[in-house]
């Protein structure tokens, strides 16, 4: 049985800004069970429940995925598979219209 590679987690500057803004506007979202469940699943490489509408993105976001946290709030992320470790990149956390997704 092969051992799972370590997972490195990184955050874009825009994700950090989105997270900070969301914490000011709607702090309850960040402690809500849907956000915590999404982060738990991603960090543990588990599939997200179907109601998160997790899907691959296309166009300028090709290679990324997004999932719906609550209403129009989406989390955009990417898994990057590398030789020594895998990386989970958090890119955006904002309402759909603010993420340039179509």
Swiss-Prot record:
Q: What is any Pfam family matched here? A: YafQ_toxin
Highest taxon above the source species: Bacteria
Q: GO terms for biological process? A: mRNA catabolic process; translational termination
Single annotated GO MF: RNA endonuclease activity
Record keywords: Ion transport included? no
InterPro entries recorded for this chain? RelE/ParE_toxin, RelE/ParE_toxin_dom_sf, Toxin_YafQ-like
> What's in the keyword line of the UniProt record?
Toxin-antitoxin system
UniProt lists the family membership as follows:
Belongs to the RelE toxin family. YafQ subfamily.
NCBIfam families under this entry? RelE_StbE, YafQ family addiction module toxin
Role description: Toxic component of a type II toxin-antitoxin (TA) system. Its cognate antitoxin is RelB.
Specify the protein name: Putative toxin YafQ
UniProt organism field:
Haemophilus influenzae (strain ATCC 51907 / DSM 11121 / KW20 / Rd)
**What taxonomic ancestry is recorded?**
Bacteria, Pseudomonadati, Pseudomonadota, Gammaproteobacteria, Pasteurellales
